[in-house]
Amino acid sequence: MKNYKIITLLLIISILFNIIRSNKISLKDSDSGSNGNQDIQILINDILNNCSSSESSSCFGTQWGVVADIYTPSNGEFTNIFSLNELQAFTPASNTKLFTTISIFYTFGEDFKVFTPFFTDKPFNSVSGGSSNSELDFICVKGMGDPSMSIDNLIEAAKFFSSNPTMKKVNKLLLDTSFYNIGNGVDGNIPSAWEWEDLTSTYGSIPTPLIINENTMDIYITPSNVIGGKPTASFKYSGEDKYLPVIILATTTTTSNSSTSTLNYSFKMSSQSIYITGNCDINGGIQIITVPILDPEQYFLTVFSALLEDGGVEISQTAIGSCNYTGMDYKSFEVISPELSEMLNYTLLTSNNLYAETFLRQMGTFNSAASESTPTYQAGLEYIQQTLSIPTSLYTQVDGSGLSRNNFITPKSLITVIENVYTNVGDPQHDYISYLPVASLSGTLSKRFINTPASGIVHAKTGSMTGVNSLTGVILPNGLSDDQQNSIFFSIIANNSPAQNTDIIDIIDQIVILLTKFILSS
């Protein structure tokens, strides 16, 4: 009986404690002062503790870095409302792109464009053909780091040079790749911190001075009309079959409803070919496999020469060379990129690695303080440090995109750069913030925060790789146009997570929704 009374008493105490605690941490609509700040701290800690409380929890062992500030425009001050490991360096994945894109936004301007010139040895136009109509000694194309250049641009250029019926021959088709100083590596265009599996995936395309279709290409796989037969491979554009031999190891499967296509591709370091394996459904129709271009220079020379030859222009020789070395070359054709504003928007919405790496190298070519021997990417990293003025003790950045796991950045430095760009007097319309994905509406956030208070008012950059998730941005209750509203800036990073990314994303989103409710109630 005595034990029963003790147990009953303990249960009553536990219930009373939970009631008191529940009342303490409830987020009241009218509470936006210091008590409200204390409440938000307790609530965020509860979310993280519930996630990591035991080994059976979905994110047990995950390392968290979280920082949140409230911005009051009436006094221009940022007040911290939550901080956990804000000075600890984490691998942030694509949140690294904030450093790269904000730096080029500050210094190059939204109207910046990239111009890719096509030089000839004599004046040439599509009508007259130049002083000697039938032959050019060379066409030299100088890559200038335009990540948006497409195969359609090449087709347009080929039509320009072949449109004159008297134009019959080009002795040399040259590609000038000297815009980047690539250093002494085996292939200095390949980011040194990237892994082979990155380079053989489309998200890890190599950032070369001349880029076509984001340095990717499509292979069209057609199933055999005989079960057990080999599918066939084809290409859309001239010259692609010469550039990339395809070895088919796949087979055509049966017509049963359970039959599905399981095509995969792989490269071998000792081979110029690509290997296609798996099964191809006989009734599945043509499948398109998009693959990275591992030798972008050779791809350009092979495909552009084939396009010219399709137009009746003979190409005698192709090579890597130098344009305008005599100062007497003539710029006969030019490809112009979209404005930087459009390219930044695309980069941030899609989290495009190639664009970010190209921006890094653009800044490297612009960095006059770098020595001549400094590789362009390294000069770009130094330029970012000079531009953002973030102490190097708060971050280590090794690439422009965040694809490397050797980037180590503190939540404090991430929230600082996003706060600074929002309050930048040179961007009164908050154009940069407008380029970021918007909760439930656009980009990599289009499927997150749906039917929540955060929908439409959270602008943030996502980051994700195995074991890593991050989100850095701002909550603007009244949208971008209200400069007098209070807002919340945040940076959340999770590292070493054993859980599926979706589980960690859910925790991050819970925190952001909580912060959203807090600012809406203040």
Swiss-Prot record:
A family per Pfam: Peptidase_S13
Keywords on record: Carboxypeptidase, Hydrolase, Protease
EC number per UniProt: 3.4.16.4
Regulation of activity: Inhibited by penicillin G.
Enzyme class: hydrolase
GO molecular function, one term: serine-type D-Ala-D-Ala carboxypeptidase activity
Full protein name: Penicillin-sensitive carboxypeptidase A
Organism: Dictyostelium discoideum (Social amoeba)
Gene that encodes it: pscA
